[in-house]
Amino acid sequence: MINLRKTHPLMKIINNSFIDLPAPSNITSWWNFGSLLGICLIIQILTGLFLAMHYTSDTMTAFSSVTHICRDVNYGWLIRYLHANGASMFFICLFLHVGRGLYYGSYMFLETWNIGVLLLFAVMATAFMGYVLPWGQMSFWGATVITNLLSAIPYIGSDLVQWIWGGFSVDKATLTRFFAFHFILPFIIAALAGVHLLFLHETGSNNPIGISSDADKIPFHPYYTIKDILGMLLLILILMTLVLFSPDLLGDPDNYTPANPLNTPPHIKPEWYFLFAYAILRSIPNKLGGVLALIMSILILAIIPLLHTSKQRSLTFRPISQCLFWILVADLVTLTWIGGQPVEHPFIIIGQLASILYFFLILILMPITSLLENNLLKW
């Protein structure tokens, strides 16, 4: 009998991607986050679709429509908080996925890595626009502050800002277009994720020791399907705990106040997952310089393959580089904390030092340390 799974044009693609895919036998739980990101994206698209059925993208009714979803729609509160906290889980998985890539040298798969960086930008853009939709105080002022950063671009800056706003301030036109973009982007992300996977399967997965695993492969199913299901259950457990016990833990209380252009909140800050980049932006006194540093803080990921000077791919057997990697992680946690603090002493200087350390570690210290470790191999 012909095995339909291996011959049917559609099922063949699924089979070669998720069933008969040869996978390294030693990949750890750090390799689970790709599938978890897929689950997060599905959760976000489904909950977002149901929210869009009841949401109105008009400045007069947006805030009320979100309240209506929470109070009057069947399980509307659940859908809304799953969507809001699902975004946080998405970013936790994203940061861990990128961190895994940095630690184990997965960035040496250039196409996969660069599409991943593109995906990160797309997810960040989607999350930013989604935060504007409830039309609370932080939505309005966050949109105003972040879009205003484009005015730092010489010559065309102010025209560009007004073009994005669709007027002379963040208003009805801005909200409507942000809703449209927020709706379409997840589908673009899904398509990009497919391309990301396509390029990954051209080379096969990396593994913790960073050497070729061609000599020792196992089928993806059942070994890694079971492993991914375990990760998925843990993800859903954490997400549901967050949603059912403290749904507003990661949100901002200011967003429960309807948007008011005449009243500025005491501290304008984005969602927690943008705070590290926001801290880098704020630590530079010059507007254009701050914007460039903000963009570079993420775009620096694209040049990491060029900074790889080590003879070994992963950090598994490089203790000095491991120390620097964990210092970088601690630095990012510090930046996240600083981003949520008011602009006053001592937070300003801590933010500036943490920002300098961030770029210094990635651009100078880590490549030099890799060269040092190459020499240590000769001893």
Curated annotation (Swiss-Prot):
Entry keywords, A to Z: Electron transport, Heme, Iron, Membrane, Metal-binding, Mitochondrion, Mitochondrion inner membrane, Respiratory chain, Transmembrane, Transmembrane helix, Transport, Ubiquinone
GO CC field: mitochondrial inner membrane; respiratory chain complex III
Presence of the UniProt keyword Amino-acid biosynthesis in the record: no
Binding site for heme b b566: 97, 196
GO biological process: mitochondrial electron transport, ubiquinol to cytochrome c
GO molecular function: metal ion binding; ubiquinol-cytochrome-c reductase activity
Places the protein is found: Mitochondrion inner membrane
Binding site for a ubiquinone: 201
InterPro entries found in the cross-reference section: Cyt_b/b6_C, Cyt_b/b6_C_sf, Cyt_b/b6_N, Cytb/b6-like_sf, Cytochrome_b, Cytochrome_b_C_euk/bac, Cytochrome_b_N_euk/bac, Di-haem_cyt_TM
Cofactor note: Binds 2 heme b groups non-covalently.
Disulfide-linked positions: none
TM stretches of this protein: 33-53, 77-98, 113-133, 178-198, 226-246, 288-308, 320-340, 347-367
PANTHER family, per database record: CYTOCHROME B
Other comment: Heme 1 (or BL or b562) is low-potential and absorbs at about 562 nm, and heme 2 (or BH or b566) is high-potential and absorbs at about 566 nm.
Family: Belongs to the cytochrome b family.
Name of the protein described by the UniProt record: Cytochrome b
Primary gene name: MT-CYB
